[in-house]
Amino acid sequence: MRVYIFLCLMCWVRSDNKRPCLEFSQLSVKDSFRDLFIPRIETILMMYTRNNLNCAEPLFEQNNSLNVNFNTQKKTVWLIHGYRPVGSIPLWLQNFVRILLNEEDMNVIVVDWSRGATTFIYNRAVKNTRKVAVSLSVHIKNLLKHGASLDNFHFIGVSLGAHISGFVGKIFHGQLGRITGLDPAGPRFSRKPPYSRLDYTDAKFVDVIHSDSNGLGIQEPLGHIDFYPNGGNKQPGCPKSIFSGIQFIKCNHQRAVHLFMASLETNCNFISFPCRSYKDYKTSLCVDCDCFKEKSCPRLGYQAKLFKGVLKERMEGRPLRTTVFLDTSGTYPFCTYYFVLSIIVPDKTMMDGSFSFKLLNQLGMIEEPRLYEKNKPFYKLQEVKILAQFYNDFVNISSIGLTYFQSSNLQCSTCTYKIQSLMLKSLTYPERPPLCRYNIVLKDREEVFLNPNTCTPKNT
């Protein structure tokens, strides 16, 4: 009986000694009103590791000692939210932490600056971003004393949080390892000089995703590489009517967050294409990624770091910003799959029209892609590339259904049109061998099914 009582007491003592989880500030509209008269700002650092995935702990203890779960030798991701006009907790926050820790054994620090971001006065929140950055710099200097390295720090900032990340980077003279800006806030930052906003000089590598550049985000490129999914605004799947309520305002702005999370959680390769404009991208002018050498096209999201070396080379000498474009689907995980169809017509042929095509696989599945350009001229022996987007990945392709549409003013029901060579290549998975067919004869508006073969090296 005494042993039983002793064990019960031990269990009670252990449970009593367990520290409570650190909770994200739960504010409300009342706090936004209160801020009108009594402004407050506070920065709370919530630390997560694989040892405390579901229970945040303070980064520093009350005696200013470093939390024993923090590993100075591992990567540290700093996750910084943006403006919170009514004090709500970011719905994506906990899932983001989970996905990061599932990807890599790291330290994750959520920067809770809700008391400073929760206000009806947006300009006040903007001014608070610099104060938060100064506060963070104090904690970072303390971490450095414990043996942490700036090179291992990856700041992920959402909206105003992106500019906070930039201000922190400026304090440390651009020595942070990486900053990712997720739709950096545009109002009060657009067209400002680099010292007043996030800039590529703020870290050794800065990647930015623009998803609401005509609204709450910013249009101009800020990083070593700037991704513009769906042109950087009007994201598919987002409400188009103001009658949709708050989602109409924030859906596009938050899409950058969800795209980055999807890049971690799924097998999607968010292949993106370096281009001067979204218009040029849609006309298939930018399907080559030769400037990225063996790495192929850049990938949006967490894996953008793979292109750090090439991008930094492009920035040496004169700043050569890299703007890249891609399209996504409208539902999570937003995957799309790119193919390019390359066509060469014989030296005695000139065609002026358009193609449509569909793919068939060995299971009998058929899918027709979204094509980006309807009509274009096909000149003698000049390769013309047609960019195609599929919503499902297509492997084990058995047949290509091809249809040619001659321009309306040149239609000829008895004419034939020759193709010297056709090559289909996956851009999403460039390691897959391209498929080819040669010496093809077509008639206007008549579909032909072609059984392609793996291209020989001289034709690729």
Swiss-Prot record:
<feature type="active site" description="Charge relay system">
    <location>
        <position position="183"/>
    </location>
</feature>
<keyword id="KW-1015">Disulfide bond</keyword>
<dbReference type="GO" id="GO:0005886">
    <property type="term" value="C:plasma membrane"/>
</dbReference>
<comment type="subunit">
    <text>Interacts with heparin with a high affinity.</text>
</comment>
<keyword id="KW-1003">Cell membrane</keyword>
<feature type="disulfide bond">
    <location>
        <begin position="436"/>
        <end position="455"/>
    </location>
</feature>
<dbReference type="InterPro" id="IPR029058">
    <property type="entry name" value="AB_hydrolase_fold"/>
</dbReference>
<dbReference type="Pfam" id="PF00151">
    <property type="entry name" value="Lipase"/>
</dbReference>
<dbReference type="InterPro" id="IPR000734">
    <property type="entry name" value="TAG_lipase"/>
</dbReference>
<keyword id="KW-0964">Secreted</keyword>
<dbReference type="GO" id="GO:0006654">
    <property type="term" value="P:phosphatidic acid biosynthetic process"/>
</dbReference>
<keyword id="KW-0325">Glycoprotein</keyword>
<feature type="active site" description="Charge relay system">
    <location>
        <position position="253"/>
    </location>
</feature>
<keyword id="KW-0358">Heparin-binding</keyword>
<protein>
    <recommendedName>
        <fullName>Lipase member I</fullName>
        <ecNumber>3.1.1.-</ecNumber>
    </recommendedName>
</protein>
<dbReference type="GO" id="GO:0008201">
    <property type="term" value="F:heparin binding"/>
</dbReference>
<comment type="function">
    <text>Hydrolyzes specifically phosphatidic acid (PA) to produce 2-acyl lysophosphatidic acid (LPA; a potent bioactive lipid mediator) and fatty acid. Does not hydrolyze other phospholipids, like phosphatidylserine (PS), phosphatidylcholine (PC) and phosphatidylethanolamine (PE) or triacylglycerol (TG).</text>
</comment>
<dbReference type="InterPro" id="IPR033906">
    <property type="entry name" value="Lipase_N"/>
</dbReference>
<feature type="glycosylation site" description="N-linked (GlcNAc...) asparagine">
    <location>
        <position position="63"/>
    </location>
</feature>
<feature type="disulfide bond">
    <location>
        <begin position="238"/>
        <end position="251"/>
    </location>
</feature>
<feature type="signal peptide">
    <location>
        <begin position="1"/>
        <end position="15"/>
    </location>
</feature>
<keyword id="KW-0442">Lipid degradation</keyword>
<feature type="disulfide bond">
    <location>
        <begin position="275"/>
        <end position="286"/>
    </location>
</feature>
<feature type="disulfide bond">
    <location>
        <begin position="289"/>
        <end position="297"/>
    </location>
</feature>
<keyword id="KW-0732">Signal</keyword>
<dbReference type="InterPro" id="IPR016272">
    <property type="entry name" value="Lipase_LIPH"/>
</dbReference>
<dbReference type="GO" id="GO:0005615">
    <property type="term" value="C:extracellular space"/>
</dbReference>
<comment type="similarity">
    <text>Belongs to the AB hydrolase superfamily. Lipase family.</text>
</comment>
<dbReference type="GO" id="GO:0004620">
    <property type="term" value="F:phospholipase activity"/>
</dbReference>
<feature type="glycosylation site" description="N-linked (GlcNAc...) asparagine">
    <location>
        <position position="396"/>
    </location>
</feature>
<keyword id="KW-0378">Hydrolase</keyword>
<dbReference type="GO" id="GO:0052689">
    <property type="term" value="F:carboxylic ester hydrolase activity"/>
</dbReference>
<dbReference type="GO" id="GO:0016042">
    <property type="term" value="P:lipid catabolic process"/>
</dbReference>
<keyword id="KW-0472">Membrane</keyword>
<feature type="active site" description="Nucleophile">
    <location>
        <position position="159"/>
    </location>
</feature>
<keyword id="KW-0443">Lipid metabolism</keyword>
<dbReference type="InterPro" id="IPR013818">
    <property type="entry name" value="Lipase"/>
</dbReference>
